[in-house]
Regions:
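Beta-strand-turn-beta hairpins that frame and shape the catalytic cleft
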Residues: 2-16, 167-176
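Acidic/histidine-rich helix-loop elements
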Residues: 20-36, 151-153
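Cys-nucleophile CN-hydrolase/nitrilase-fold catalytic domain and related Cys-dependent amidase chemistry
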Residues: 31, 35, 39-138, 145, ...
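CN hydrolase (nitrilase-like) catalytic-core segments centered on the catalytic cysteine
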Residues: 86-106, 174, 180-276, 291
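Short beta-strand scaffold segments in enzyme catalytic cores
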Residues: 107-109, 122-126, 166-168, 252-254, ...
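Active-site catalytic loop in hydrolytic enzyme cores
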Residues: 113-198, 208-221
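C-terminal beta-strand edge segments of enzyme domains
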Residues: 234-349
Length: 349
């Protein structure tokens, strides 16, 4: 796209309550609860657009907005209870929201994959106003869930390199997705930015506070480093778990490419995190000859030399003898413990 076609529109980081499916006794009960959540989210989007105005063209939902996260369930149990099919009724209902309201809808959830029946992935999906899925990003760094990195060779065989850091060139700019705590990793955002991403849609469910938190600091940093917008939606509380409801609440925000917070929500379900996204601003900043143009000054070849020598978190750790392994409950903690021990042995930490 050229500057003459650079769009300006309103983006909404919808801070919605997450009603976790952990207490559900069967997959059928969980699916019914998820569909009820979609009905509620649809009503929240309708009310928000009616209040804000028809300029809303991008709505970002919180992380795992329909399910919450696994709390003691095995991989097989969580896959059956909470992971949805890419062509399932939940996706169809979300696509209808996007088409009915003429928006790009970004959402996050656990999903199945026919290539990996032993696993599930946490996916970020963007649906355009026609109801088509224009972006699917699978979370690459996760403490307690499988990721494409854990089965990297097999994943690349199935989907190719471009599936790792996808960028969608849309009518509202070039979009990419960052999942939850991945906002803390500069490389995740940067590898999207070097493929042209101008807007990071960030679905999260995180501890927030009036004080500076690591993730909130990171949102500003990722915007400044990459001269990109960050549209970050947090949960507006979570029910159905032993964790107090407001622990993952408040702080949904929109950050512009200069690191300026344009809008931010307080506690509870809220549509207050909405603001104008001006794609022309991002493009002007990226094409400006200036010290502040950090994206244009990145010595990527230099980084690549040193990164190639580094060995920290292993790839393919859910592969054994060419076969995908279903992770045991202790797998993720055991893996991190082994990484820490290896770093200590080498004198890195």
């Amino acid at each position: 796209m050229t500057d003459t076609s650079a769009p300006a529109y309103t983006a909404l980081a919808l801070q919605s309550l997450c009603e976790a499916v952990n207490p559900c006794k069967s997959p059928e009960e969980a699916r019914a609860k998820m569909m009820a959540g979609i009905v509620r989210i649809r009503a929240e989007i309708a009310g928000s657009i009616a209040f804000i105005g028809p300029e809303v063209k991008l709505v970002v939902l919180p992380e795992y907005a329909l399910t919450g996260f696994p709390m003691g369930e095995s991989a097989a149990e969580w896959r059956a209870k909470a992971a949805i099919d890419a062509d399932g009724p939940e996706f169809e209902a979300m696509a209808k929201i996007a088409s009915d309201f003429g928006i790009h809808l970004a959402w996050n959830g656990y999903e199945t994959d026919l290539h990996f029946p032993e696993l599930y992935f946490q996916g970020c999906v963007v649906i355009d106003p026609s109801g088509a899925q224009v972006l699917r990003y699978r979370r690459l760094i996760s403490m307690y869930a499988p990721s494409p990195y854990d089965v990297l060779d097999r994943y690349l065989d199935a989907y190719g390199e471009d599936a790792l850091f996808p960028v969608a060139d849309t009518a509202i700019g070039r979009l990419s997705a960052i999942a939850s705590e991945e906002i803390l990793y500069p490389e995740i955002a940067r590898l999207h930015a070097v493929k042209g991403a101008e807007v990071f849609v960030h679905s999260s469910s995180e501890v927030s506070s009036p004080l500076a938190t690591p993730k909130n600091i990171a949102k500003l940093a990722r915007a400044i480093e990459n001269l990109a917008y960050v549209v970050s939606a947090n949960t507006g509380g979570m029910t159905g778990t032993p964790i107090p409801q407001a622990s993952a609440d408040r702080g949904s925000k929109i950050v512009d490419p200069r690191g300026i917070i344009l809008a931010e929500a307080a506690s509870g379900p809220s549509m207050c995190a909405f603001a104008e996204v001006d794609i022309a601003l991002a493009r002007r900043l990226r094409r400006k000859t200036a010290m502040g143009n950090l994206l244009a000054r990145q010595p990527m070849a230099l980084y690549a030399r040193e990164y190639a020598k580094a060995d920290i978190h292993p790839e393919g750790s859910l592969m054994k003898d060419g076969e995908v392994q279903t992770p045991a409950k202790s797998f993720y903690r055991d893996r991190q413990t082994a990484v820490i021990e290896a770093l200590a042995k080498r004198g890195v930490i």
